[in-house]
Amino acid sequence: YIFYDNDYELFYNDGTILNEFPESYDLRNVSNVSFVTNVKNQGNGGNCWSFSAMAALESAILKATNGAVSLDLSEENMKNLMACFSPFGTTYETNVGGNDRLSNAYLTAGLGPVLESLDNYVPKDYLSAIFNPLTHIQNILWIDRSDYLDNDGIKFALLNYGAVSVSCNFDRDYRNGANHYYYG
């Protein structure tokens, strides 16, 4: 069930789980319905983790409502409330990176999600107000992988719940060029 809006519009997802993976699958067109929202620009804010999490949640809501509810959720509110300048935050500084643990904590603690229209994204801002969350989030699926070829959990999540959020760690040490290189 998804409760949405002040009228508490109720959407029912019958819980059908698909276990067979098709040869190809595109969330942008599943039986002429898109389960992804528009691409957003984080600029140089170091907040990809927040954008990834909100895009996955927006996709999950689209998937659960068969495209009936499309939301633009606030990455700004998430990244600021989970940083060191917030009473709910961690030791992470704002705008210099994060991870899925932060986004999951924000959502399951009831701090969000909130709409983008309440707290617009500004790449280098540090503070956000606390708003009532749009809906309650629970049962976040955390996918473990045994190695880089173990992708069935990701396929299962894409097929049944929508987009996924993926964390990765980049450090200046990766720029050494000996056997790996990252420049971002």
Where are these regions (language model features)?
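N-terminal zymogen propeptides
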Residues: Y1-D26
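Alpha-helical support elements that line or immediately flank enzyme active sites
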Residues: Q42-N66
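A short glycine/serine-rich beta->alpha loop
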Residues: S34-G46, F88-Y92
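Short, intrinsically disordered, charge-biased short linear motifs at domain edges
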Residues: D14, S31-T37, Y121
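Short, glycine/acidic-rich hinge or "gate" loops at secondary-structure transitions
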Residues: T65-L73
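Predominantly the structural core of cysteine protease catalytic domains
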Residues: F21, D26-N29, W49-E58, D72, ...
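Short, flexible coil/linker elements and helix-boundary hinge sites characteristic
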Residues: E9, G15, T65-N66, G110
